[in-house]
């Protein structure tokens, strides 16, 4: 039988992976599969190929069905189980997944050792205590320090193992202190809309609920608005199922990107993050005051809690408190912290209650 070979260069591991497929794939499917195996997201592939995200998503779903691949999380495993693959230069033949050891690879061949996880405290506006945290991943510099935590750095690519790694890190960090946390403490994990398609989010959420329960800790999935949210609208049933399992949803950077008022109407969000550009000049611009107040009042009527994200001055914090905003986050209160520093800050805050 004629075969098609796909060759992948894993630079971090000084290896080349060769995979042989039966001649059942078109040139477009071969190119798409190669990019998916390299860790490119649907969004990145759409830009490289000048195709819409929707088109690439549909092509990927058809490809996975043809190859009997369950999801992105199982892509490498399913490929190694069903097709012949081998590594160079070691020439390890592996007709099934269990007979080989493949390094864990995330986006574009980067290992998780290249990343740090940071926790930014979210404060209760009424009493000033830490009410939750925003969890993000930042890529390290060559010297081991972290890149600046701007939104372009911390929004990881969804088509990789970082989601599972992130959940594992959170479980390990909070398990020893879960009984010390105040009731309603919420942990916010940033994801992209296409993660609903490309990552086994629901499984990770259910495992989290199994470990921590629902009485003390709230798990919040926060959706980026940098890309279109049509995927969220398309998979509302999945979101509602997740929500019915006591996982909460948040809309990030409201007022920016693709965030629309209709999303508040059609998707069961419990939180919205009010982007700092919506209030950064609140002290000098009356129009900003009107817009921010309108968004806050609308959210209240929809029973959605507002998190003022990007507080830089005490006056901004005071303004938000006066308007009845429940939660505050920003460098005026605390910068994102490594895990150990965050836990120390959190436990110190709890002792003051």
UniProtKB/Swiss-Prot annotation:
GO terms for MF: cyclic-guanylate-specific phosphodiesterase activity; DNA binding
Q: Which Pfam families match?
A: EAL, GerE
Q: HTH luxR-type domain location, by residue? A: 18-83
User: Is the Magnesium keyword given for this protein?
Assistant: no
Q: Which domain of life is it from?
A: Bacteria
Instruction: Tell me which UniProt keywords the record has, alphabetically.
Output: DNA-binding, Plasmid, Transcription, Transcription regulation
Task: Tell me which Gene Ontology terms the entry assigns under biological process.
Answer: regulation of DNA-templated transcription
Q: Which residues bind DNA?
A: 42-61
* Segments forming domain EAL: 98-350
Q: Which InterPro entries match?
A: Cyclic-di-GMP_PDE-like (IPR050706), EAL_dom (IPR001633), EAL_sf (IPR035919), Sig_transdc_resp-reg_C-effctor (IPR016032), Tscrpt_reg_LuxR_C (IPR000792), WH-like_DNA-bd_sf (IPR036388)
Which protein is depicted? Answer: Uncharacterized HTH-type transcriptional regulator YuaB
What gene is it encoded by? yuaB
